Amino acid sequence: MEFDTIAAISTPMGEGAIAIVRLSGDEAVAIADKIFKSPGGKSLTTKDSHTIHYGHLVDPKTNEVVEEVMLSLMRGPKTFTREDVVEINCHGGLVSVNRVLQLALTNGARLAEPGEFTKRAFLNGRIDLSQAEAVMDLIRAKTDRAMNVALGQMDGKLSRLIGDLRQALLETLAQVEVNIDYPEYDDVEEMTVPVLVEKCTWVRDEIIKLLQTSSQGKILREGLSTVILGRPNVGKSSLLNSLVQENKAIVTDIAGTTRDIIEEYVNVRGVPLRLVDTAGIRETEDIVERIGVERSREALRGADLILFVLNYADELTAEDERLFETIEAMDYIVIINKTDLPQKINLARVKELAGKHRIVTTSLLQEEGVTELEEAIAALFFEGQIEAGDLTYVSNARHIALLHQAQATVEDAIAAAQAGVPVDMVQIDVTRTWELLGEIIGDTVQESLINQLFSQFCLGK
């Protein structure tokens, strides 16, 4: 497949030690050769692949020196895109990197679209669609475990499993074709039905195993949606600041200071938390605060974990007890804050209301109890769930939806075969399952979906 030559800045914009401008395509080396001058004056076209060269970029129209650079030359197909690739390392300033990019564009390259380098890797057969999506997961990973899951998917872990499932279905379809081609032989159909049921059952079971990892995989990918809950002025914002280790929320003695929800990502002992500091949930006449309270209720409904904060120096109120009832069926940790003040809270009643849920005492003002809280969060998350590093996790919402559809169609095939439906009719569901699994890795997917997926990538990737 032939494409034009593209170029883009592949590093984040801003000031830094270096920046990289990447070119990919049949003319990448020729374009670079027009603008690159080495001390020895030798052409890049004579250089070996996978080599690095020092020199200057020079505008061929004016002979003006634009930048001092290191240039990496890599010839296809042993590159990310399977095309000729040139990466120009220049100084990391906004003006510098933009001048380098403009020089490449005015000498024959086209500005790359978002995700176009990865899209070319997919279209040229270097990676499949699930591996391409894993590239973005790797970039966005917020913990080591999330990064390891993305690396496993990039390495083809999920692709190989999906390939095995599709191969089993293909073998089943081949057996069905034999039955269709030789309908006069009853024993052929008698052999076909058990094989079909056996292989489809194995495929279904493997799909179910994958889907069982989806909740953990989604958390690793997107973070554990964690709501900080409690009455106003019990220390919710102080807790957010302690976990994030920055002053993201206003901390005052005035109840109701947090009028809106505040979100922040934080890595707590390998657990990615998407922390939401809510406005205190209470009845209020203040219109602005009431909007914040309603948003807090919405956040609560979508939470994976609740950090329920109580005040050690206050008696339990009817509002506290109502909040216990609200979160009764959810995963939560009770945090009794302000232990540096005289005790007024009834600890026995808190234990009774919390039941089996963990209780941690803290004095966030004195920075006490935060370590114990982090340990409690990690213990809750990792308890028998996610320690097995050899699991293949599925976390992408598109993959999960396709797996659910594939499970439904393969179960229809099993039920139909067992009910005595002719195998040529059962074949329809088996084929549809094969197609749905193919959409995960991009074998059976529409071009419009491919374009949409890659448009979500950043420029230069």
UniProtKB/Swiss-Prot annotation:
Phylogenetic lineage: Bacteria, Bacillati, Bacillota, Bacilli, Bacillales
One MF term in the entry's GO annotations: GTP binding
All copies of domain TrmE-type G, residue ranges: 223-382
Presence of keyword Metal-binding: yes
Its EC number(s): 3.6.-.-
Protein name per UniProt: tRNA modification GTPase MnmE
Gene name in the database record: mnmE
Main location: cytoplasm
Source organism (scientific name): Lysinibacillus sphaericus (strain C3-41)
Needed co-factor(s): K(+)
Swiss-Prot/TrEMBL keywords: Cytoplasm, GTP-binding, Hydrolase, Magnesium, Metal-binding, Nucleotide-binding, Potassium, tRNA processing
Residues annotated to bind K(+): 233, 252, 254, 257
Subunit structure: Homodimer. Heterotetramer of two MnmE and two MnmG subunits.
